Regions:
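C-terminal accessory helical subdomains adjacent to catalytic cores in phosphodiester-
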Residues: 2, 13-39, 50-156
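Extended, compositionally biased accessory segments flanking or bridging domains
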Residues: 7-9
Length: 156
């Protein structure tokens, strides 16, 4: 099975080896071929998204499914919330059973904050976590991607 995954940028693409490793340990003999399709900052919208999905599903080497992964914070006001983003992507693509829109409630990079101690070790810095009890609170005003970028720029 081939699954094309539309992603917004370099962080998401860099995540794929770890995702493949995680899935291969759990999908014994049923591991799909994950094909990341990377864009610069946000995946296409409206008619362009529909054309891309159609091409991926019916091209020379067609995918069996297409997953679109987007953030709420795309640098625009295209989406008001996660449900709005999923609904709009589904509407733009149309009635395609093997298209699966998925939305990171905040930045994709926020998913990385779960491993804050490991991030600090990798950056070789000591810094307390930039949120209180709820990591989602840090999105407003300064997204996780910017915080992570600053952390690695100020390293040792």
């Amino acid at each position: 099975m081939k699954v094309a995954v539309l992603v917004e940028g370099k962080t998401e693409r860099a995540f794929f080896p770890f995702l493949r490793s995680f899935l291969s340990q759990r999908l014994h003999g049923q591991m799909p071929n994950l094909d990341p399709v990377t864009y610069d900052g946000r995946i296409p919208t409206e008619g362009k998204l529909q054309r891309i999905v159609t091409t991926l599903l019916a091209g020379r080497h067609p995918a069996d499914a297409v997953i679109a992964l987007t953030d709420i914070y795309t640098g625009s006001t295209a989406f008001s919330n996660a449900q709005d983003a999923k609904q709009k992507m589904s509407t733009w693509v149309g009635n395609v059973n093997n298209f699966f829109p998925h939305v990171a409630l905040h930045d994709f990079e926020a998913w990385l904050l779960h491993g804050w101690d490991a991030i600090l070790r990798q950056a070789r810095v000591e810094k307390k976590q930039p949120w209180g009890a709820n990591p989602e609170d840090i999105d407003h005003g300064k997204p996780p991607a910017h915080r992570l970028g600053e952390l690695f720029q100020t390293g040792p």
